């Protein structure tokens, strides 16, 4: 099932919102939200969490940071940098794939725990892409694309990229 999510100024519009509310009242969904840096993953995740009264949300950046306390930089250098500032001895795409594969077991563990506890969960982040996480572990996978400007990209890279927006119902 596909849902259309649009951004207009500071508003997130989910065209099939009523359908989502009905579905989420009946089940505790496990949701993944992927997309490039600055696409609005955190914004959409927070809007879904708040307005659909879901239980938990975590970003892959938080998961990556936790993993860096347990893994050595010499073996997992891709976890010790941001996706938009990859390590220098490999291509950005290779860095992205390595990062996605490195955090996949931790993401899958979070999904398994949420399912076992009967709680809803949103995981959002750059390192989420189809084919990396086992399909049977989640209910919905949103991939966002960015139509942002260079100015918005600079805000994201330099900081202050997460802003509050309202959900149009």
PLM features: residue spans?
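Extreme N-terminal, non-catalytic leader segments
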Residues: 1-30
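Post-Walker A helix-loop "phosphate-sensing" segment adjacent to the P-loop in P-loop NTPases
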Residues: 49-60
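Conserved nucleotide-sensing/catalytic segment adjacent to the nucleotide-binding pocket
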Residues: 57, 69-119
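Hydrophobic anchor at the beta1->P-loop junction of P-loop NTPases
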Residues: 33
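A glycine- and Lys/Arg-enriched "phosphate-lid" helix/loop adjacent to the NTP-binding pocket
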Residues: 139-169
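Hydrophobic positions on the alpha1 helix immediately C-terminal to the Walker A/P-loop
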Residues: 44, 48
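Conserved glycine(s) of the Walker
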Residues: 40
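The conserved Walker
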Residues: 36-37
